[in-house]
């Protein structure tokens, strides 16, 4: 699967500080990547109703992490997926009378266009589930051969395959939830804890036997069917990055059961106790009092904002004005503030000189290194813009150019 064009990232003088992020599994700030090669996996979209502000908030946040790593001088490998076959996609295709493959292709292309518009660095490894089916089949076969999975007769013939969580004593270490909370979230987020015959209610689906009217693939030894959700990301991450890797990223609603189960699969498949050194999760974006959600339909789409004439960098700044791991609400005021900020920064940057640029570079670097504190980074640039527009500070030739390159390179905001 092809990704989107990479934006040009300006080179800045010096190097950035080591970036620390909040690890969900431990609740502590940790160095995001300790070696010279940083490896990141971020769960991608299920391609329908792309790309809403919840998506954008997540991918912009991890884009800042990638940019900070590059500023440190690290080599970065970024992997992501597209869940281009899944129940919600199939349900939407049926409801709209569109072939599921056409819907997935159209929405994946729209997502790529939106990421290009927002200046997001594309993944180096970008794979759809459909193209990864052979690798998923091999992983499920391996789990069965190790007695870490089992078969359960499907209603229409053939066998579904489930992971046996008793093979992984580490299950639960990512989200750190009580059993009752895990059961509730499993039922809410695509699991089937009440299915009869399962060894444990939380055992996740690895392979779904063919059902009438659903896509399926031949899999010798498994029978025709399609992959379960969690094993897809486990396979794409391990194939694209190797195990262990540095950061597993995604929205906070993916911590359980998705990231919990993917990590479990990788532990059993690879024998690696901690497949991702850190799990980093972004907050939820709300709109009109509820989490922005495809099921609720309360979506604000990037493409619609841009079609309505909103400056793309204002959309990006609206996201960056909030701490990545905090929940926040999209409002007209949030957008208006971001639009005013873009205009103000551009006025301040329009001259040949201005206040000293080095404090801005140092301040933005320090903010980004401190758990991607983009609101603090914006405040640093705001202060410089205020001083520049007031014209009451010593004048430094070329300062606006350095500031513009700083916000472009580290925040992805092109002036």
Swiss-Prot record:
Please give the cofactor(s) recorded in the UniProt entry for this protein: Zn(2+)
A cellular-component GO term for this protein: cytosol
Q: Where can the motif 'ERGGDP' region be found?
A: 188-193
Annotated L-cysteinyl-5'-AMP binding sites:
43-46, 58, 81-83, 229, 251-253, 285
Question: What's the catalysed reaction?
Answer: 1D-myo-inositol 2-amino-2-deoxy-alpha-D-glucopyranoside + L-cysteine + ATP = 1D-myo-inositol 2-(L-cysteinylamino)-2-deoxy-alpha-D-glucopyranoside + AMP + diphosphate + H(+)
Q: Which GO terms describe its molecular function?
A: ATP binding; cysteine-glucosaminylinositol ligase activity; cysteine-tRNA ligase activity; zinc ion binding
Q: Which residues bind Zn(2+)?
A: 43, 233, 258
* Root EC class: ligase
Cofactor comment text: Binds 1 zinc ion per subunit.
Where is the motif 'HIGH' region annotated in this sequence? Answer: 45-55
* A Pfam family of this chain: tRNA-synt_1e
Task: Quote the EC number.
Answer: 6.3.1.13
Q: What does this protein do?
A: Catalyzes the ATP-dependent condensation of GlcN-Ins and L-cysteine to form L-Cys-GlcN-Ins.
Query: What family, per the record?
Result: Belongs to the class-I aminoacyl-tRNA synthetase family. MshC subfamily.
Check the record and name the NCBIfam families matching this protein. mycothiol_MshC
| HAMAP family the UniProt entry points to | MshC
The protein's name is L-cysteine:1D-myo-inositol 2-amino-2-deoxy-alpha-D-glucopyranoside ligase
Provide the species name.
Answer: Cellulomonas flavigena (strain ATCC 482 / DSM 20109 / BCRC 11376 / JCM 18109 / NBRC 3775 / NCIMB 8073 / NRS 134)
């Amino acid at each position: 699967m092809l990704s989107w064009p990479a934006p040009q990232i300006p080179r800045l003088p010096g190097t950035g500080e080591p970036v620390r992020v909040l690890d969900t599994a431990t609740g502590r700030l940790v160095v995001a990547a300790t070696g010279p090669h940083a490896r990141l996996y971020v769960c991608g979209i299920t391609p329908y109703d792309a790309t809403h502000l919840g998506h954008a908030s997540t991918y912009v946040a991890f884009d800042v992490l990638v940019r900070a790593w590059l500023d440190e001088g690290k080599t970065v490998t970024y992997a992501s997926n597209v869940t281009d076959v899944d129940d919600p996609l199939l349900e939407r295709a049926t409801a709209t009378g569109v072939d599921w493959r056409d819907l997935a292709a159209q929405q994946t292309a729209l997502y790529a266009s939106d990421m290009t518009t927002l200046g997001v660095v594309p993944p180096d490894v970008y794979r759809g589930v459909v193209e990864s089916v052979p690798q998923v089949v091999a992983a499920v076969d391996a789990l069965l051969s190790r007695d870490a999975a089992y078969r359960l007769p499907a209603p229409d013939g053939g066998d579904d395959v489930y992971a046996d969580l008793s093979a992984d004593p580490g299950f639960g270490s990512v989200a750190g939830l009580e059993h009752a909370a895990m059961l509730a979230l499993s039922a809410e987020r695509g699991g089937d804890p009440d299915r009869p015959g399962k060894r444990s209610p939380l055992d996740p689906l690895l392979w779904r036997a063919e059902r009438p009217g659903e896509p399926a693939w031949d899999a010798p030894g498994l029978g025709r069917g399609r992959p379960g959700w969690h094993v897809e990301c486990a396979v794409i991450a391990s194939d694209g990055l190797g195990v262990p890797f540095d950061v597993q990223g995604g929205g906070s609603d993916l911590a359980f059961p998705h990231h919990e189960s993917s990590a479990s699969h990788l532990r059993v498949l690879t024998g690696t106790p901690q497949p991702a050194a850190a799990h980093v999760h972004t907050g939820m974006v709300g709109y009109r009092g509820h989490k922005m959600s495809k099921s609720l339909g309360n979506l604000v789409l990037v493409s619609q904002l841009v079609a309505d004439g909103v400056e793309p960098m204002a959309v990006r700044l609206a996201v960056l004005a909030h701490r990545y791991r905090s929940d926040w609400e999209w409002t007209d005021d949030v957008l208006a503030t971001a639009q005013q900020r873009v205009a103000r920064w551009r006025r301040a940057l329009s001259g040949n000189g201005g206040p000293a640029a080095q404090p801005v570079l140092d301040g933005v670097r320090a903010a980004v290194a401190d758990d991607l504190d983009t609101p603090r980074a914006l405040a640093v640039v705001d202060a410089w813009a205020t001083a520049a527009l007031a014209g009451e500070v010593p004048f430094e030739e070329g300062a606006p150019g350095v500031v513009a390159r700083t916000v472009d390179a580290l925040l992805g905001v092109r002036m």
